[in-house]
From Swiss-Prot:
It is found in: Endoplasmic reticulum membrane. Required for the retention of luminal endoplasmic reticulum proteins. Determines the specificity of the luminal ER protein retention system. Also required for normal vesicular traffic through the Golgi. Residues 22-35, 81-96, 138-149, 200-213 are cytoplasmic. The chain crosses the membrane at residues 3-21, 36-53, 62-80, 97-110, 118-137, 150-168, 179-199. GO terms for molecular function: ER retention sequence binding. It is a multi-pass membrane protein. It comes from the Eukaryota. This is ER lumen protein-retaining receptor erd-2.2. Disulfide bonds: none annotated. Keywords: Endoplasmic reticulum, ER-Golgi transport, Membrane, Protein transport, Receptor, Transmembrane, Transmembrane helix, Transport. GO terms for biological process: protein retention in ER lumen; protein transport; vesicle-mediated transport. The keyword Membrane applies. One of its GO terms (cellular component) is endoplasmic reticulum membrane.
Amino acid sequence: MNIFRISADMSHLLAIIILLLKIWKSRSCSGISARSQILFALVFTARYLDLFSTYISLYNTTMKITFLAATYATVYLMFFKFRSTYMRESDTFRVELLIVPAAILALLINHDFAPFELLWTFSIYLEAVAILPQLFLLQSTGSAEVITAHYLFALGSYRALYIFNWIYRYYTEDYFDPIVVVAGIVQTVLYADFFYLYVTRVVQTRKGMELPI
């Protein structure tokens, strides 16, 4: 049993649950970037298109279905049920600046040119930067609700824990994938400043988080 991978997946699942509960209970998606959520939906769609053709384990299949369903549910809530609360004017990050480079990188740096492999590689690259619209939105508004901060911390922890998973697999299985490791490090670095602000302004004060603009 790889405790690091399970912990990472549980942290990821916790992040998604926090986000869905935040939106549903408050009846609002204020402070949440729909553009980031669309990118995450694209990430999981590209990564899990092999859902019905490749079976690894019940755990793996269950997590795939859960992440897909939860992400699309979030997008639905933001664009339909609670669309009037979506901060469209502030959520302006140009996602094509992330999607196009990720697609080009997937074509240039990959393990194989098989369709599913290219889609998987694209999803790894895109996931590394998919949080940028959310961080950009926080920077634009200058603050984050406590529950939104908890969501982002859990999401960042998921990727940080996966770094320990890769270290564990390297020493126990002699497994090393430079694509996922480099992308994971980039993603973790993007969260670094947020982690610091989370600890100093949310955990210690138990209040919302004001960001320097």
